[in-house]
Amino acid sequence: MEYKILDKGFLRLVDMMGDDYAAVKAARVSYGKGIKTPEKDKNLIFYLMEHGHETPFEHIVFTFHVKAPIFVARQWFRHRIGSFNEASLRYTELKDEFYIPDHVRKNVVEDKQKAIKVDDEQLKQKALDLIESSIENSYKVYKELLEMGVAREMARIVLPMSSYTQFYWTVNARSLMNFLNLRADSHAQWEIQQYALNIANIFKEKCPWTFEAFLKFAYKGDLLKGGE
């Protein structure tokens, strides 16, 4: 399944190892017992989450294919417990694909981590026009440099942070939950929130018990609980 995100981005689950039962079996291996009844297995997952026994969830592993603006990817890569492989602009030419927002935000004075949408239509349109003009000019210069024979590894330095990139992300469920705590939250940048919310949908579908327990006992954000 592919989730369309932002104007040109996407999120795909391309591989997965384990599910709720993988965490159950990992937790019970210490005393030689495996899967029991579904009710007891679910209760065990809830017990593990409530009491902070998180290592069994490392046996559930997801691999995602992500297309996102570079500024989103750079925030994503700060989650270091996981494996990343990204498309290289040293060896490939960038396509004419950039994130063009449909709204403009301004900072909240009381909370520097939050930003709210601008209602002033004149200000909004002026800002969006400036953004689009800057992007178009940067890409024009990039193409001119390539046509002059400048190496891709040098020509790329003029490209904006709104350029789309693609990468694979392999992550275990424990680290994925940490990602959701930080990015499925109103303090995170709006663009990465959109990816986090779709990851949460996949997590809920593939590991419903673990996701339910996570929301009940370990989730520290606000967007998955009706936050703004």
Swiss-Prot record:
Residues binding FAD, per UniProt: T55, R78, H79, R80, E86, N172, A173, R174, N178
Pathway(s): Pyrimidine metabolism; dTTP biosynthesis
Active site: R183
Alphabetized UniProt keyword annotations: FAD, Flavoprotein, Methyltransferase, NADP, Nucleotide biosynthesis, Transferase
Sequence positions that bind dUMP: Q75, W76, F77, R78, E86, A87, S88, L89, R90, R156, R183
Chain span(s) of sequence motif ThyX motif: 78-88
Keyword Phosphoprotein recorded: no
Entry's family note: Belongs to the thymidylate synthase ThyX family.
Assembly: Homotetramer.
The name this protein goes by in its record: Flavin-dependent thymidylate synthase
Gene designation: thyX
